[in-house]
Amino acid sequence: DICGVQPMTGPTGLIFAMRSTKGTNRDINNSAVETFFNEVDTEHSSENSADGLASNDQTGSNPGLLADGASNYTIGGQGMTTAQSEALGDGSSNHFNEMGFSIEKVTVTAKSRALKAEYSLELAQDLKAVHGLDAESELANILSTEVLAEINREVVRTVYKIARPGAQNNTATAGVFDLDVDSNGRWSVEKFKGLLFQIERDMNAIGHETRRGKGNILICSADVASALSMAGVLDYTPALAGNSNLLPDDNSSTLAGTLNGRIKVYVDPYSANVSDNHFYVAGYKGSSAYDAGLFYCPYVPLQMVRAVGQDTFQPKIGFKTRYGMVLNPFAKGLTAL
């Protein structure tokens, strides 16, 4: 639910990413600048390769800082004249500017998990006679549940580890949203709505920095989910449609509900809930299995193996699985986990 799934067909695999660049595909030094990620430079197609024409680099990224007469936000390239366009390519210093692409890869290698259990025939006989339970089935359930739970926690902890700090602007302390300071509400419901606004800001930041889409998943502690729920319940004219559908419970489903009809909220049942400080992690997962920041790559599904001790003739069972885990190449550079 919180990461993409790309099955592996062998013990090692490759994840490819294509980047559009300014420059030529023959650039072996890989110094070409990526484009289509943030705002395009209006100068590139209005200049020759030597940047010898009259257009200037655009400056500034926040129109909100634009002031009359200020030069902190400029247009940049505004096109060539007809004469300049006709002259392109007529000399060694007057070539067309070029575009290209690069194919980059990240290697993912399968890793393994394994557990075993042994039991005596006498134990199996007594367990069946007294409790009506099958020893092999019970141990198999224990082993498989443990392995799958460990993989699940590895995924969640990996998400926490690779997540970038949020709340970087308009907060007293960068990375911390203080309900008493940053929200500045008169009562709890207003402070909780301030928290919701900060969550939306972090969701917007994901869309701005990744250019994939606005954040749509939230992992948080039960108290944070309860605060979001109460923000809608306590308000007599709720503007937060859908918040009353949040049902945070550490001991039931980790999916608490949907926030604003769009954001799926998951509760981490193992976070330190009885604490002065709480957390949330905002993320994005697209409709495609390839549109995520983290990929779980199953290779060999959980397999059960039976054996009998060569000396004791007592039964043994074991479980093994193999899988990989890797970041999206666009998420944090070309770094495999």
Segments predicted by a language model, with ranges:
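Eukaryote-specific, cytoplasm-facing alpha-helical/coiled-coil scaffolding segments in long proteins
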Residues: 13, 20, 165-175, 244-250
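Intrinsically disordered, low-complexity regulatory segments in eukaryotic proteins
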Residues: 1-9
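Assembly/oligomerization interface modules of large self-assembling protein complexes
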Residues: 5, 14-110
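Short, glycine/acidic-rich hinge or "gate" loops at secondary-structure transitions
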Residues: 7, 135-136, 151-173
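Extracellular/periplasmic catalytic domains that process cell-envelope and extracellular macromolecules
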Residues: 8-11, 108-111, 210-212
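Sequence/fold signature of self-assembling virion shell proteins
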Residues: 1, 76, 83, 89-93, ...
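Acidic/histidine-rich catalytic neighborhood
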Residues: 166-190
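Short, solvent-exposed secondary-structure capping/transition elements
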Residues: 26-34, 126-129, 151-156
